[in-house]
Regions:
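A short, amphipathic beta-strand motif
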Residues: 3, 220-222, 611-615, 688-697
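Short Pro-Gly-centered beta-turn/loop motif in secreted/extracellular proteins
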Residues: 21-30, 254-260, 636-662, 674, ...
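Feature captures outer-membrane beta-barrel proteins of Gram-negative bacteria and organelles
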Residues: 101-104, 129-142, 163-175, 310-332, ...
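Transmembrane beta-strands of outer-membrane beta-barrel pores
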Residues: 88, 117-121, 143, 152-156, ...
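Membrane-embedded beta-strand positions of outer-membrane beta-barrel proteins
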Residues: 111-115, 148, 180-182, 295-299, ...
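Short, ordered, surface-exposed loop/turn motifs in non-cytosolic proteins
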Residues: 5-17, 617-627, 698-712
């Protein structure tokens, strides 16, 4: 059953119950292993309890093990609640889930599909039809997850091609908090460019860490003179609050909050005295918190459709957070005729976060010999507290002429072998900048972004920058922006853009948006879109768009519409558009088929990790952990989105259930591994239901609240107002017992016979019958 410690769910366990001497009530008992899994420190228990635990096969109740410790059993929901003083709870990072609770799921397979067909009619160019089918197949066997992704395109012109995107087997390596991948996949692209490969890869997975230990956040250290309250804020927002004991304290489980803003720490002592200090907080993408590390190791062949052969390569990376200020990282790549090494680090200071790394590469090119080069990358991030200016990310990268990345090197080698020249275009430098400036008094926000790229063997550079302003007036949101772009050939253009958005009431989630844009060549576009849903659960949503384009002096008016239906088994979409010269129609179907031990279950599109619900006879019940999800006629439903290594709550709303079916519990929690398919079994009690109007033989009403039991003593319900009772789980005919005052003063028996059962219908009213409750001897 589920075990909840101090209002925090810790997992599902097999528990033993033992009766206490002189007490009929049995209590759950715990051994050292179970206490450890629950995060409880038995060294804080009473000496007598510690001595009992030291015995072989010891099992003691938590009640009485130390002051204020208690347990409460919720038998109906199969849940045990423990209340334990904080002194006996081991400290762990927030949202920590013991790996023993990670669920590998069941053996099952699935096929996820995305089918789209487009039809275009053009007055001068005729008709054209194209169809796309995307497939994602998987099979889970024990800890292994087998996956394949591919796509098929075909058209009425006879073009047809299936493309395999990735095929691999993957599993967790729990002690290393890592993933092992075998087959066709991709590298992460953290330090080096992302590569498609066929081979083997072992890499750490940050998702296995508690959410409070992911990403970068500084460790906050200080000293308290008493039992003190510590409040940590960032830009006026409270991030964390806790109580610490006298002496030095350390808080190392702050959630990462993006690119920063210094932390304001206030320590309030027991006598009301306060003292404050600040901790610098800014981060570039490769920053790690103190003591954290990441690594990857890949061995395989490079996959690139432009290459005639697939060279073998090996790549390794390592990152480590030395302390609050410094993170370091390094990496290497080796292949035939190629080698590179990278070394870098990041520094967090009061002036912001700085990152720098240098990559040295050596490439052998046919006819040109050995080429050596370097690539320097610089990055910076900072939030200026005085003005709240957010320099989200500024990066600069410069590569010398002799520098090649692995894919660049292999393509250049191939071009030189095949054509005798080097036609592959390579970057010389790249610069990006992003700024955001909130304005005081709710006057909106200014934002600026810019990028520039230059290339070897090409004069000129690509340049793009944009400045914009966004705000809202009551419920009307608006954005105004201006963009300028120039390519390396000197072609330039300016675009001015204005957009408005307005929600239209809350009943059906409707909104109206419009936009206008115009460029320096005189081309313009105006567009208005109405979106909404026909119900609050968004089973059916729609959009209608009207637009006018002016291009090279020609006007074109287009009217288009789209419709999306979300069902429990699939999503169906369609669109129509009509312009001056062109009309288009499309139809799409997205969904999945999940194969398991009891058959096939249809589903909405799946994410990497999803769950399978089984609730016998609960067809029609709504699953609240998603949109438009219902239990099917076989008692199964798929929850298409779960978060791996985190506690996920999955709930069923009994509304819509037949009155002849009762859910024993309406929610469960699961902690799935990445790619797992956990099975969530919701126990149900089936049987016919009825409202019985019954009185005692002398005409007196039955006592309000009296228990209604079957002949085996199982509780079926209770007597309500007006001597009516509602009972579920009945047979077509039989007897039920009404008992009050624990049977010491009254019992009576009702004999019933229900009308022939009609077809089970969700929400159908229970049968109404009249009867008399015949007295039976009272229990002593």
């Amino acid at each position: 059953m589920d075990v909840v410690v101090n209002d925090e769910w810790h997992g599902r366990f097999n528990l033993s119950f033992k009766a206490r001497p002189g007490n009929e009530e049995a209590l759950a008992c715990f051994d050292n292993a179970l206490l450890e899994r629950l995060g409880l420190d038995s060294s804080k228990f009473y000496p007598q309890a510690q001595q009992q635990l030291s015995a072989a096969q010891a099992c003691i109740p938590i009640d009485g093990a130390l002051d204020d410790a208690s347990s409460r059993l919720d038998f109906a929901n199969q849940r045990l609640y423990l209340s334990v003083p904080q002194i006996a709870v081991k400290r762990s990072a927030r949202e920590t889930v013991d790996p023993s609770q990670w669920d590998s799921g069941i053996t099952a397979g699935f096929l996820d599909y995305n089918l789209n067909t487009y039809s275009t009619q053009h007055r001068s160019q005729g008709n054209f039809r194209q169809t796309y089918l995307g497939l994602g197949a998987g099979l889970n066997i024990g800890p292994w997850r087998l996956r394949h992704d591919g796509s098929l395109n075909w058209s009425d012109q006879g073009q047809q091609r299936y493309q395999s995107i990735a095929s691999y087997a993957q599993r967790d390596i729990t002690p290393w908090r890592s993933q092992l991948t075998l087959g066709e996949s991709y590298t992460s692209g953290g330090l080096f460019d992302s590569l498609s490969y066929t081979g083997i890869r072992l890499a750490s997975d940050d998702r296995m860490l508690p959410a409070s230990l992911r990403g970068y956040a500084p460790v906050v250290r200080g000293i308290a003179s008493s039992n003190a309250r510590v409040l940590i804020r960032q830009r006026g927002v409270t991030l964390h609050e806790t109580t610490v004991a006298p002496g030095a304290f350390e808080i190392d489980d702050l959630y990462a909050t993006g690119y920063g803003g210094d932390l304001e720490v206030t320590v309030t002592e027991a006598d009301g005295r306060e003292h404050s200090f600040s901790v610098p907080y800014a981060a570039v993408p490769l920053s790690l918190r103190a003591g954290a590390s990441r690594y990857s190791a890949t061995l395989g062949t490079l996959r690139n459709q432009q290459l005639n052969s697939n060279p073998v390569f090996v790549e390794g990376t390592w990152q480590y957070g030395l302390n609050n200020l410094v993170s370091t990282y390094s990496g290497m790549t080796l292949a035939s005729g190629y080698g590179s090494a990278l070394l870098g680090g990041s520094l967090n200071t009061e002036l912001g976060a700085f990152g720098a790394d240098l990559t040295q590469a050596r490439t052998h090119l046919p006819g040109l010999g050995s080429q050596q080069g370097q690539s320097l990358r610089l990055s910076y991030a900072k939030t200026l507290s005085e003005t709240d200016t957010q320099i989200a990310l500024a990066t600069y990268r410069y590569s010398t002429r002799g520098f090649y990345g692995l894919e660049d090197a292999q393509l250049s080698r191939q071009f030189l072998r095949d054509a005798g020249d080097q036609r592959y275009q390579r970057h010389r430098s790249r610069t990006t900048l992003s700024l955001a400036q909130p304005l005081a008094l709710n006057y909106g926000q200014l934002h600026l972004s810019a990028s520039a790229s230059s290339y070897w063997d090409h004069a000129g550079s690509d340049l793009s920058y944009s400045i914009g302003y966004s705000n809202h007036y009551k419920t009307l949101g608006y954005t105004l922006s201006s963009t300028r772009e120039r390519d390396r050939f000197g072609r330039a253009g300016n675009t001015l853009y204005l957009s408005l958005s307005l929600p239209l009431g809350s009943e059906r989630v409707r909104s109206l948006s419009s936009s206008i844009s115009r460029d320096s060549n005189g081309n313009s576009r105006a567009q208005a879109t109405l979106t909404g849903a026909t119900s609050d659960d968004q089973h059916l949503s729609y959009g209608i768009t009207a637009s006018q384009d002016r291009h090279h002096g020609q006007n074109n008016h287009t009217l288009s519409s789209n419709l999306l239906y979300r069902g429990s088994a699939a999503e169906l979409s369609g669109s129509l558009s009509q312009g001056r010269h062109t009309s288009q129609a499309s139809l799409g179907l997205r969904g999945a088929i999940v194969a398991h031990a009891d058959g096939l279950t249809l589903s909405q599109p799946l994410s990497e990790t999803f769950g399978l619900i089984h609730a016998k006879d609960a067809d029609g019940a709504r699953v609240t952990s998603g949109t438009a999800l219902k239990v099917d006629s076989s008692g199964y439903a798929v929850v298409p989105n779960l978060t791996p290594y985190r506690r996920n709550t999955v709930a069923i709303d009994p509304k819509g259930l037949s009155t002849d079916v009762e859910l024993q519990s309406s929610s469960q929690q699961t902690v799935p591994r990445a790619g797992a398919i956990p099975l969530l079994v919701f126990q149900t009690r089936s049987g016919r239901s009825a409202v019985i109007h019954a009185r005692q033989v002398d005409g007196q009403p039955l006592p309000f609240g009296a228990a209604v039991l079957d002949t085996n003593g199982n509780e079926l319900g209770a007597v309500g107002q007006g001597s009516q009772l509602f009972a579920r789980g009945l047979q077509d005919e039989g007897e039920i017992i009404v008992r009050w005052d624990n049977g010491s003063t009254g019992n009576c028996r009702i004999t019933y016979a229900l009308p022939a059962a009609a077809k089970k219908t969700a929400g159908a009213a229970p049968q109404n019958i009249q009867s008399v409750c015949l007295a039976t001897p009272a229990h002593p």
